[in-house]
Design a protein with these regions (language model features):
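Membrane-proximal N-terminal soluble sensing/regulatory segments of transmembrane proteins
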Residues: 23-84, 103-119
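Extended, amphipathic, non-transmembrane alpha-helical segments
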Residues: 91-98
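Internal alpha-helical transmembrane segments of multi-pass membrane proteins, especially GPCRs
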Residues: 6-9, 25
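Sec/Tat signal peptide C-region and signal peptidase I cleavage site
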Residues: 13-22
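Positively charged n-region of N-terminal signal peptides that target proteins for export
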Residues: 1-4
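Extracytoplasmic
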Residues: 115-135
């Protein structure tokens, strides 16, 4: 009976030893990533939503992703995936701020759609996939 209790206790305690960030990426980062994407897509598709309020929302939502990433740590054994997520997001954000948003604001919609549907789509998809791997 003591042996059975010891085995049960070991399994129970092992369950408590799950890293504190299990699910953290999907629960906290994914919604911020989605909000950042949605704010930019709204600006791109709706010419009447390119004013200062929407521009601020586009910047704030991207900054929220960066801030959340800065608070997070790689789960044990997944340091490479976390590093790749941070680097991919940084490239995505830089292109967004220095190329994509300026194209949208200049009314160069076709160029913006090409950039948004090309490398930026690849990067955001990679970020989403890495979040899945990190959870």
């Amino acid at each position: 009976m003591k042996k059975l209790l010891a085995v049960f206790l070991a399994f129970f305690l092992a369950g408590l030893a799950v890293p504190a960030n299990a699910g953290e990426f999907g629960d906290t980062l994914r919604p911020k990533l989605s909000a950042a994407r949605e704010s930019l897509v709204t600006m791109m598709l709706h010419k009447d939503q390119r004013g200062s309020d929407q521009q601020k929302l586009v910047k704030d939502t991207a900054d929220a992703v960066s801030a959340q990433l800065a608070k997070m740590k790689a789960p044990a054994g997944k340091e490479a995936q976390f590093k790749e997520l941070v680097e991919t997001w940084a490239a995505f954000k830089k292109t967004r701020e220095t190329e994509l948003v300026p194209l949208i604001l200049k009314g160069k919609d076709e160029e913006a759609k090409k950039l948004g549907g090309g490398i930026q789509k690849e990067r955001i998809t990679k970020c989403q996939n890495l979040i899945n791997e990190l959870d």
